[in-house]
Amino acid sequence: MSAGRLNKKSLGIVMLLSVGLLLAGCSGSKSSDTGTYSGSVYTVKRGDTLYRISRTTGTSVKELARLNGISPPYTIEVGQKLKLGGAKSSSITRKSTAKSTTKTASVTPSSAVPKSSWPPVGQRCWLWPTTGKVIMPYSTADGGNKGIDISAPRGTPIYAAGAGKVVYVGNQLRGYGNLIMIKHSEDYITAYAHNDTMLVNNGQSVKAGQKIATMGSTDAASVRLHFQIRYRATAIDPLRYLPPQGSKPKC
């Protein structure tokens, strides 16, 4: 399945999720071009997410959302101006081919969301997205894996971990190959990366356990599934919420 063009809603969700995928996910790459902000207003640049802006400005995601009337899944658009809650005038380094003028901000990135704020186990039922061996667990470290990587033979079926609506099918996010994202509620999104064949379309409703793809190695060193569960834009440890492999959830 070829990647389709993104609508605004899907693009916003991709921008949101890309902070985990592009800045701290399995590719480990970071954006080399960041924006600037002055006073208490930040202008959204290409590739920004609410979480990335939070880290840059020191304003929490919750506060940014409150000040700007943004609801989950926290969609933002290029050029949008965001209030920062009275932040002091600051600017951050920006690489450019124009004159070399570099300013450095004295802002402290916000810390990772503590586990105490994660949803309680059993609040929602999740199914394993595939069968296989977990070769890379979730990590809370900066630059660590914000999901789990599961290895199995090429073509192994991949299933929706829960019922929901497909909000992205494509390969525009570098380092994640053929990627599918499913929105399960206003709070939860799951992501399935490195697929071989993708069997769903944008906007399609899926059932829990429905086959959505086959395992592949697109943009990966080996055949694997990179799987994420995101709760209110924050990546949480899937192993904490999935039942033991081979068993049904008890919730």
From Swiss-Prot:
SUPFAM superfamilies: Duplicated hybrid motif
Residues bearing a lipid moiety (N-palmitoyl cysteine): 26
Major localization class: membrane
GO biological process, one term: cellular response to cell envelope stress
Region (Disordered): 93-115
Biased composition (Low complexity): 93-112
Name by which UniProt lists this protein: Uncharacterized lipoprotein YgeR
Source organism per UniProt: Escherichia coli (strain K12)
Record Gene3D superfamilies: Glucose Permease (Domain IIA), LysM domain
LysM domain sequence ranges: 40-84
